[in-house]
């Protein structure tokens, strides 16, 4: 299995904070609120702006209650459910994210189509998992820092979900990272896991998103800043995967991920 690229080797990490980056982000915002996009919708850019779109299907996997739906909601700038309700079927969410490529200095609009399915539905209906995996470009594997069992279940999840697709992008995400006082997953265990599996690992918080001045509306720009590391990480891994598949890059970079 090819090693993933080093962080920041494909995508310019903090480009979204630059003046140019903020101009592109404006197309996925409306008055500092995130725009919602349906399956057939896309951001509207000025006629003078020519930009390529790279589309990817991403299946989100993990035990019930680890925060799969909450993660997708955060990435899309939607309200995170306060009370946990298991997803009853397959739920798809589209997220657009502009990013600048380091090698070419070009901006690409990444379109991520997240597929989320409740654990009970996956067990009850045999066709659910194949449907989620069909034509997938990447898998996100979630665990909760407050649920030791979800972390110990990761190897089984990786084998069960991605065992037949060893070459696809696989990323591990630890949710509820802000609840460090109650963590059941110490740093040494994370280090051992990363050394064994050589997969990118990101941490996300479970705190509610910041609000605009009205106290009710989610602050779209603040939400993007909070999740940019995950969106950039996804873009980096997927773009690198495409370049390797096209024969434009070697399958194993010289350096391991940091």
UniProtKB/Swiss-Prot annotation:
Gene Ontology MF annotations: GTP binding; GTPase activity
The residues listed in the UniProt record as binding GTP, with positions renumbered to this chain, are 64-65, 67-70, 82, 84, 87, 176, 178, 206
What InterPro entries does the database record attribute to this sequence? P-loop_NTPase, RSG1, Small_GTPase
Keyword set, alphabetical order: Cell projection, Cilium, Cilium biogenesis/degradation, Cytoplasm, Cytoskeleton, Exocytosis, GTP-binding, Nucleotide-binding, Protein transport, Transport
Region Small GTPase-like: start and end of each range? 51-258
Q: Name one GO cellular component term.
A: ciliary basal body
Hey, which family's this protein in?
Belongs to the small GTPase superfamily. Rab family.
Q: What is this protein called?
A: Ciliogenesis and planar polarity effector 2
Source lineage: Eukaryota, Metazoa, Chordata, Craniata, Vertebrata
């Amino acid at each position: 299995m090819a090693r993933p690229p080093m962080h920041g080797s494909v995508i310019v990490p903090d480009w979204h904070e630059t003046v140019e980056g903020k101009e592109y982000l404006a197309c996925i915002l409306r008055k500092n609120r995130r725009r919602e996009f349906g399956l057939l919708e896309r951001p509207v850019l000025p006629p003078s702006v020519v930009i390529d779109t790279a589309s990817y299907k991403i299946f989100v996997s993990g035990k019930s209650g680890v925060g799969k739906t909450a993660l997708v909601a955060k990435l899309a700038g939607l309200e995170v459910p306060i009370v946990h309700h298991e997803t009853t079927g397959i739920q798809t969410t589209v997220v657009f994210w502009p990013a600048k490529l380091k090698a070419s200095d070009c901006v690409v609009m990444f379109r991520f189509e997240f597929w989320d399915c409740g654990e009970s539905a996956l067990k009850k209906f045999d066709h659910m998992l194949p449907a989620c995996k069909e034509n997938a470009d990447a898998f996100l594997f979630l665990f909760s820092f407050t649920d030791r069992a979800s972390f110990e279940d990761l190897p089984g999840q990786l084998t069960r979900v991605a065992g037949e697709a060893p070459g696809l992008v696989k990323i591990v995400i630890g949710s509820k990272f802000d609840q460090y006082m109650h963590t059941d997953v110490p740093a040494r265990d994370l280090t051992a896991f990363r050394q064994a599996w050589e997969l990118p690992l990101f941490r996300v918080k479970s705190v509610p998103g910041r609000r605009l001045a009205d106290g009710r509306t989610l602050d779209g720009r603040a939400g993007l800043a909070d999740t940019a590391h995950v969106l950039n990480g996804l873009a980096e891994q997927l773009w690198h995967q495409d370049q390797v598949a096209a024969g434009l890059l070697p399958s194993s970079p010289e350096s391991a991920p940091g």
